[in-house]
Amino acid sequence: AVMVIAIWLIAAVLGWYIGGMNLAISISKTVYHEDIRTVGSGNPGFTNFRRVYGDKYAWFIFIFDLLKGAVVCLLFGLWFRYLGFDFQLGAAYTGLFIMLGHSFPVQFSFKGGKGFLVLLSELFVLDWHAGLIAFIVMTMLLLTTKYMSLSTMCALTVGAVCLFIFRCNIPAAVSYAVCVLFMVVRHKENIKRLVKGTDNEFHLGS
């Protein structure tokens, strides 16, 4: 019983703390001596960092955020399964706190990113079929519209629906869907700009 209580608490605390590790903020402060949250769109994530500072460190941030979500969700999912719980439930529960930590990092005054990469990597852990479909949707939309925000919101929404279609653990699927909804809400300024046709475009080669 103690171990069961411990894993739920450890997953929540570690998930939030690791989720709060933000290379975009750390590198912008260390290398460029300014806070990424005060330049560009103000979002401390891969897209804004790349737009402001270029490719030099941006892809490290991209890889780190993907690994941050995938590795931690995978490890805790396996630990939950070892203790007799559903793997997907453990991974999604941990992913919920990683997302909260990424959005409201204790280390950075609770002002974090929107969490797309974290949620995409978590989706692959929950069901790689759903993750692959979401990635394809994102890629196709990004190539045709050039809008990263639109592509990510649509891709993860499709991914969340796929979890239900592929009979994912229901509490896990619901938890993931709530995270996606939360991410979409955090894109409200992007949505306003998309409606006006003024949102920033994303170009892979620039």
Model-derived regions: residue spans:
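N-terminal signal-anchor transmembrane alpha helix
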Residues: V4-V31
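Transmembrane alpha-helical segments that form the membrane-embedded catalytic/substrate-channel core
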Residues: Y17-S26, G95-V106, L181-N190
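Multi-pass membrane catalytic core of lipid/isoprenoid biosynthesis enzymes
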Residues: R51-G77
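Helix-coil boundary and interhelical linker segments in multi-pass alpha-helical membrane proteins
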Residues: A1-A11, C73-Y93, F124-A130, L163-S175
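Interfacial segments of multi-pass membrane proteins
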Residues: R50-D55, F76-F80, F97, G101, ...
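Short, non-helical or kinked segments that cap or interrupt transmembrane helices
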Residues: D35-G45, Q107-L120, Y147-A155
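Cytosolic, membrane-interface loops and tails of multi-pass inner-membrane proteins
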Residues: I25-A58, K192-S206
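Hydrophobic alpha-helical transmembrane segments
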Residues: I5, L9-V13, W59-I63, A91-L96, ...
